[in-house]
Amino acid sequence: MAHQGDPNISLPFPASPVANNNGAAIASRSPLVDPTIYPGNSRSISSIALHALGLGITLSACTIATIQLALSGYRIWRLTEFIATLSLFHFLEFWTTARYNTANAKVSSYLLTSNGSAYLIAHLAAMIEIIVTSFYFPGLQDRYSNAYTIAFGLALVVMGQAIRSIAMAQAGVSFNHIPAKSKKNDHVLVTEGLYSHFRHPSYFGYFFFAVGTQVVVANKICCVSYLIILWFFFKDRINHEEQDLVKFFGDDYRSYRQRVGTGIPFIP
């Protein structure tokens, strides 16, 4: 049986000889550690842990607050419900990436700050509309919100989140939060599962998830705004992304594009 000092053993880390108490040479193991997992880097374990803790606390606190506020008849339950939904979404973005696309999991995979200022402004606008209508224009909420609209909105949120997360899982290493500009060796054209029904199921899922969040909280202005802005955003993004996908996969992608639609209304 080979032992630690066997020169024929290929170790996953460098071994340097040091002396034991008897003066004999033994192998000292110094693990090769990815420097990006240290604090301040893109895969910082400490930062990942803090993000998960923060999202978990926020999700738990806001879920409890939503239930208590709703049962007590306070309209502001919509604000805590919206924040709870966002907390779960951002956690699942990282978790799904870490589980099915491990090599590409980074702190930025939470998408908390990497989606740009427009993304943050959209959420801030939704929160402001909730606060303003809850305290100053409650009649608007009563006009557009009831048990049926809330249930419909929640159905859109759950469906959208499920489709997006499953799409990320099925794409595996071929999924990127930022569209790839060059083809990697492990990048393959995924056409099975959800991808046999939608060309971009993660976009389809997020489109209806985002609109659903506004239906739940009865945000009339943001609901219409989200619908319009996201439609133009995904139309433009899909157009540019597919130009690169045609370069990567040629006729295979052209054929796939002819067979399968996006599922997003009026985006073929």
Identify the role of each PLM range.
Residues 178-206:
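Active-site-proximal inter-transmembrane loops
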Residues 2-185, 210-268:
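Membrane-anchoring alpha-helices and their flanking helix-loop junctions
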